[in-house]
Regions:
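Non-catalytic positions within long, well-ordered alpha-helices that form the structural scaffold/packing
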Residues: 15, 110-113
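Stable alpha-helical elements in mature extracytoplasmic
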Residues: 3-11, 98, 102-105, 130, ...
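Aromatic-rich peripheral "rim/lid" segments of glycoside hydrolase catalytic domains that contact
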Residues: 108, 123-138
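Second-shell loop/turn segments in exported
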Residues: 1, 91-95, 119
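Active-site region of glycoside hydrolase catalytic domains
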Residues: 2-39
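Conserved, mostly hydrophobic/aromatic
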Residues: 26, 109, 117
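Glycan-binding loop/region signatures in secreted carbohydrate-active enzymes
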Residues: 28-108, 137-138
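Active-site proximal loops enriched in glycine and acidic residues that flank catalytic Cys/His/Asp
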Residues: 28, 121-123
Length: 138
């Protein structure tokens, strides 16, 4: 079910299929996903709302830091269920990873004794902020 995806369900699916926990690697993106034409935003700040587009690439972390986070009317919010930040300006929704969300994921994989973490892709973190965080906390 691609519409109810989450890390825990994926991990449990592999473990239930016989894959040892220490063989599982958690993948995280250094890029964002963006939806335009988000409708009926109201008090939910765009979270879970219908959009005019199916979503697509929203820029890498470096671009977000440079031009989007706290700029152009975008406000950073936190999705408590998914444990990730997102940006919303009343019409455009951008979901991404940052050091806070990486911290949650690193704590999870350590708790579960998973094999490690991987990211895609190196050039999407030109300042090295995310990579340095991973290195320091793994």
């Amino acid at each position: 079910n691609l519409f109810d995806a989450c890390v825990e369900k994926a991990v449990n699916g592999f473990v239930n299929a016989g894959v040892p926990m220490e063989k599982l690697i958690l993948g995280v993106p250094f890029y964002s996903r963006k939806w335009d034409g988000v409708k009926g935003a109201g008090c939910r700040n765009g979270l879970g709302m219908e959009a005019e587009t199916v979503g697509g690439y929203g820029g890498d972390y470096g671009e977000l830091k440079e031009s989007w986070i706290g700029k152009r009317g975008f406000i950073r919010y936190w999705d408590e269920q998914a444990k990730v930040p997102y940006l919303f300006d009343g019409e455009t929704f951008i979901s991404y990873e940052d050091c806070e969300s990486l911290g949650v994921k690193i704590a999870y994989l350590k708790e579960k004794d998973m094999g490690g973490i991987m990211f895609w892709e190196y050039k999407c973190d030109p300042s090295g902020e995310l990579l340095s965080f991973i290195k320091k906390n793994m």
